Amino acid sequence: MRFSLTWGLGGMAATLVLLLMGSGILLKFVYEPTPVAAYDSVQTLIAGTPYGKMIRNLHYWCAHLVVAVMFLHMLRVFCTGAFLRPRRINWVVGLGMLVVVLGANFTGYLLPWDQLAYWAVTVSTGMLEYVPFIGAYLRETILSDGELGPRTLQLFYALHTAVLPVVLMALMAYHFWRIRKAKGLVVPRSPDSPVQENPDRAPVVPDLLLREAVTALVLIAVVLLLATLVDIPIGEPGNPGLSPNPTRAPWYFAGLQELLLHFHPVVAVFAIPLFVGFGLLAIPYLKYEADTGGIWFASRKGRKTAGAAAVTAIVATPLLILADTWFAGAGSPPGGLAPAFANGWLPTLVVLLAIGGYTTVIKIAFHATKNETVQSVFILLAISYAILTITGVWFRGEGMVLTLPW
């Protein structure tokens, strides 16, 4: 069995989840989930608990790595056509697990109760105001009198340590069962190979088990090395009266925060995530011309359209960010346009037209099939969001102004 079939990403994600739960249980022995004691309990964990600092470092690195690994796993599944029948439900389950992992990371981000955590969560919960109908109610439910307080911390602690882990473990068990029901992993094949009714499969024991065990051991060694050599600092205690500049959301929401700078808030916080979410759920249920399961990028032509999508995203996304930044800072909008339209809805219209134009060009220039077109647009949006995240994390300075990181 070739390692390049899956790159071990699913096994790595499962390993990181188990490490997170094990280290999280140990952290619970010291942590106190109250605004008065939370920060001091983390300080005690770092300075006064044997191996406490290393366990906290381990938990931190696993939490951030699992988000990246699960995102890469989703890309691998998509690019090898492993979301088609009979694996359609498992694609939906995988998306659910990614959402739960993001929720677990977000709820855990607040628990140290330092300045970075306090204001990152403040910014993120502030985005809820722009969700129509239920946004204000959700924000009031989470916050205590309009700001983070005891109720917020207790809610996040309960979700982080009890509710979300149980949901994640249930989804993982169902995910693995669905893989078995689908008769294992998707069988790799070349673009010219026909679909085999009864392909030769490698046994789980010892082939798959041995490969995944080796991958897990290497990953554990890397994470332990990071936990030993790279300490995770803790800042000053959270202060509601003193916000840092810039105030950033956690890195996995930095792309969403970047969107807020370029689109109308309702579009950035509600419409785009809703559209992308429904699009991801619908992907396996679209009617495609052929079964491309096991073929990287669907076909040889699909590899070209995927490359075109990557190049387009890498070139166009930074240019659009720069253009919108210049346009927003140029003063009053031209043509008497309302500022809310010029700085919010107009970029939305431009992006929609650009995506529509790109889709048309791909179909005409490459004679792309539906599968190749969907794949190309998916890669275009995924890389664009990655660039938005990089911009939000490293290229935003004081006042969220574009700046160089060095």
Over which residues does each language-model region extend?
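Periplasmic/ER-lumenal interhelical loops and adjacent helix-loop junctions
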Residues: 136-140, 253-262, 266-267
